[in-house]
Every structure is written in structure tokens, then in C-alpha cells.
Amino acid sequence: MKLTITLALVTLALLCSPASAGICPGFAHVIENLLLGTPSSYETSLKEFQPDDAMKDAGMQMKKVLDTLPQTTRENIIKLTEKIVKSPLCM
């Protein structure tokens, strides 16, 4: 659960930072695949960012942990992220 909360907070910090002009579609795709996709689809979504092997391995370990959460929990994390990103605080 701590990992999920950490991931959600990091995601929100990145998406709501004043430096971001909007949500990077590629980043949103990676997060969606991290939470709801298959390990293969997640790995494929990372390729365009050219992570090194250590980064890929860390991401796959996080994917395995997140996949142990119930589907509805992962869907609700996505909904929460979308709600926060669309709030006036992130505009």
C-alpha cells in the first residue's frame, strides 16, 4: 500500500508541477499500463523513453507489486489521478 501511495503522489507531483504545460501523453500511457496493462504492454510503453536495464527492472518490479492490488483499487487510483489533474489546483 505504501508503494501505491508513493506512486500516486509522485505521479500527481509530476502532473501538477508548474513546469508542466500539460500531461505528457506518453507518461500518461505508461502510468495507465503500469496500473491496468499487462507486463508486456507496460514494457512496450517504456521503450520510447529508452530506459536502461536497471530502470526497466525497477519498473517491472513495481508493476509486479501493483498487480497484486485488486483491479478495482488500480482503477480507482487512475480515477483519483485524473480527478486531481483536472482540478483547479493543477490548472
From Swiss-Prot:
Major localisation: secreted
> Is Secreted included in the keywords of this UniProt record?
yes
Residue ranges the record marks as coiled coil = none
One GO cellular component term noted in the UniProt record for this chain = extracellular space
Where is the signal peptide, in residue numbers? Answer: 1-21
Xref: SMART domains:
UTG
Keyword list, A-Z: Disulfide bond, Lipid-binding, Phospholipase A2 inhibitor, Secreted, Signal, Steroid-binding
The GO terms describing molecular function are:
phospholipase A2 inhibitor activity; steroid binding
GO terms in the biological process aspect are:
signal transduction
Provide the protein's localization.
Secreted
Q: What job does this protein perform? A: Uteroglobin binds progesterone specifically and with high affinity. It may regulate progesterone concentrations reaching the blastocyst. It is also a potent inhibitor of phospholipase A2.
Assembly description: Antiparallel homodimer; disulfide-linked. Interaction with LMBR1L is controversial.
Please report which protein family the annotation says this sequence is part of: Belongs to the secretoglobin family.
Task: Give the protein name, as stated in the record.
Answer: Uteroglobin
Q: Which organism is it from?
A: Lepus capensis
